[in-house]
Amino acid sequence: KKALEKIKSILEKGGAEVIEVKDDRVNPSKEEILVLMYEFKIGLEKYLANSNSPYKTLKELIDYNEENKEKVLKHFDQSIFIESDKTSSKKSEYLRALDVVLDSRNQIDKLINENNVDALVGLSWSPAWEINHDGGDDEAIAKQRFWVNGGRAAMAGYPNVIVPLDLVDGLPIGMSFIGTAWEEKKLIQFAYAFEKINGFFPKPKM
């Protein structure tokens, strides 16, 4: 809450009118993951086909990892590889999911146009979480405060300019300026003005 209040205060200090935008739509994370898994296999195998690697398919990489698991799977499994390899038979599901994901463009456009705003702003990501070799990211994230913004912009292929905001729990967090297609120049101008007023440029502690 304090971070959001800081964003509002800086924006108003810079002459912006801040309008609260309500968006209660659920992020299509299930569809997003299916699209990611499906396209990951295609992209990886296209890369491997033109590389010097002796392995040309995702399945060959999975088999190699399994054969050498004591060395290469010491900390993490390869469940993402395995799930991605299963998507070859899911083209129709992929196409439906892709339609849902790409509809994020319409959702962002609608929020901007209906509320007559130049950009959508909000907190970007929560502080970085600790590496958990046993439980992975999910378990690590569960132990701390977590939020995320900008996923819909990523799915839409729309610009999302992130600038430093403040420290939370001793770790840096950022804020996002999200816009519609081809609005990069305007968003960068907003972000630059925000950074000048905020003046938050922490030096890392070694």
Predicted regions and their residues:
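Gly/Ser-rich, acidic/histidine-flanked active-site/gating loops
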Residues: K1-S53
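Short glycine-rich anion-binding loops that position phosphate/pyrophosphate groups of nucleotides
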Residues: N50, W125-A128
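Stable alpha-helical elements in mature extracytoplasmic
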Residues: A3-I7, F40, E93, S104, ...
